[in-house]
């Protein structure tokens, strides 16, 4: 009988005199929507930087493509207005969009690589060294490149 009473005492030892279970700790309730999703200043700052980068890249792509389309549509060689699009215009517009994407990707991948760009933003690197590091960087080369031999 004493063995059973010891087990009973162990089972109710975590109860306070009112019978409330002190071992149960309720989970923290989120106070705001931001704490529920674990969004702090650093996370918001990173999302803002990513959004600005996406905006700049998209704007550069669309602006370059817009300029190419205007140049193609105002060709002085076409003296009369054709009823449809001229094949030369279509090829120029297609190549313009392709080169616009290529230029935007090249600018934002190599020029704004996070390690180099953060050094520039925080004043540890100058603009000229930022540009030179793009040229000299081995990231641009491949194994068969004559420069890297």
UniProtKB/Swiss-Prot annotation:
The keyword Endoplasmic reticulum applies. Keywords: Cell membrane, Endoplasmic reticulum, Membrane, Repeat, Transmembrane, Transmembrane helix, Transport. GO terms for cellular component: endoplasmic reticulum membrane; plasma membrane. Residues 1-35 are annotated as: Disordered. Its main location: endoplasmic reticulum. Residues 69-89 are extracellular. The chain crosses the membrane at residues 48-68, 90-110. It is found in: Endoplasmic reticulum membrane; Cell membrane. It is a multi-pass membrane protein. Induction: During exponential phase in rich medium and repressed in minimum medium, hyper-osmolar medium or in sporulating conditions. InterPro entries: Aquaporin-like. Gene3D superfamilies: Glycerol uptake facilitator protein. It comes from the Eukaryota. The keyword Transcription does not apply. Residues 1-47, 111-149 are cytoplasmic. Aquaporins contain two tandem repeats each containing three membrane-spanning domains and a pore-forming loop with the signature motif Asn-Pro-Ala (NPA). Water channel required to facilitate the transport of water across membranes. Involved in freeze tolerance, osmotolerance and cell flocculation in liquid cultures. Is non-functional in most laboratory strains. Belongs to the MIP/aquaporin (TC 1.A.8) family. This is Aquaporin-like protein 2. It comes from Saccharomyces cerevisiae (strain Lalvin EC1118 / Prise de mousse) (Baker's yeast). The gene is AQY2-2.
């Amino acid at each position: 009988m004493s063995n059973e009473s010891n087990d009973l005492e162990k089972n109710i030892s975590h109860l306070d005199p009112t019978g409330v279970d002190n071992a149960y700790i309720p989970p923290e309730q989120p106070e705001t929507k931001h704490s529920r999703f674990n969004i702090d200043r650093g996370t918001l700052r990173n999302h803002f930087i990513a959004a600005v980068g996406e905006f700049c890249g998209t704007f550069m792509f669309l602006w370059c493509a817009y300029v190419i389309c205007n140049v193609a549509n105002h060709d002085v060689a076409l003296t009369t207005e054709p009823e449809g699009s001229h094949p030369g215009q279509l090829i120029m517009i297609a190549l313009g969009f392709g080169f616009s994407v290529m230029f935007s990707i090249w600018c934002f991948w190599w020029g704004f690589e996070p390690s180099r760009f953060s050094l520039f933003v925080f004043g540890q690197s100058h603009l000229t060294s930022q540009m030179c590091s793009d040229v000299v960087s081995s990231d641009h080369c491949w194994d068969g490149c004559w420069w890297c031999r």
